[in-house]
C-alpha cells in the first residue's frame, strides 16, 4: 500500500495479498473485493462508499469452477457510490465512474461512464487536470 493512502473501515476483501494499492488512494467504508484474479489500484484514485470489485466468478454450468480475471484501475480515477466492477475490467486514467454504475467492460482514459451496464456519457479534457 502506497504512502498517503487512506482506507476507512469496515471493508471486506478475500485474498488481500493479490491487491496492490498506489499512493494517495482513498477507499471509503463498505468496500468489498473478491480479489482472486488480482487487483491493481494506481495512484490518486478515490473509491466511494459501498463499492464492489470482483476479479473472479463462477462458471454458468459448473458452479464449482471459478474463473479469475484481473481488474486494473489506472491513475486519477474517481469511482462513485455503490459502483460494481466486474472481472477483467481496466478503468482508464482520469476516468469517472458514476454512482450505481455496473462496469462490465473496459473504460477508456478520460471517460465519464454511468448506468447498468456502464456506458460512456462524455470525455473529460485531459489538459484541465491538476498536474503533480
How does the language model describe each region?
Residues 8-90, 116, 122-132:
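Flexible, glycine/small-residue-enriched loop-and-beta-strand segment within the central core
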Amino acid at each position: 500500500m502506497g504512502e498517503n493512502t487512506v482506507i476507512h473501515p469496515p471493508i471486506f476483501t478475500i485474498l488481500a495479498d493479490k491487491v496492490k494499492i498506489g499512493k494517495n488512494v482513498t477507499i471509503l467504508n463498505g468496500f468489498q473485493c473478491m480479489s482472486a484474479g488480482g487487483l491493481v489500484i494506481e495512484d490518486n484514485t478515490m473509491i466511494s462508499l459501498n463499492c464492489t470489485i470482483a476479479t473472479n466468478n463462477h462458471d454458468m454450468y459448473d458452479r464449482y469452477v471459478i474463473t479469475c480475471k484481473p481488474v486494473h484501475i489506472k491513475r486519477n480515477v474517481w469511482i462513485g457510490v455503490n459502483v460494481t466492477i466486474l472481472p477483467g475490467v481496466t478503468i482508464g486514467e482520469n476516468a469517472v465512474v458514476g454512482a450505481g454504475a455496473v462496469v462490465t467492460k473496459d473504460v477508456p482514459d478520460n471517460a465519464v461512464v454511468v448506468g447498468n451496464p456502464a456506458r460512456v456519457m462524455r470525455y473529460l479534457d485531459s489538459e484541465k487536470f491538476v498536474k503533480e
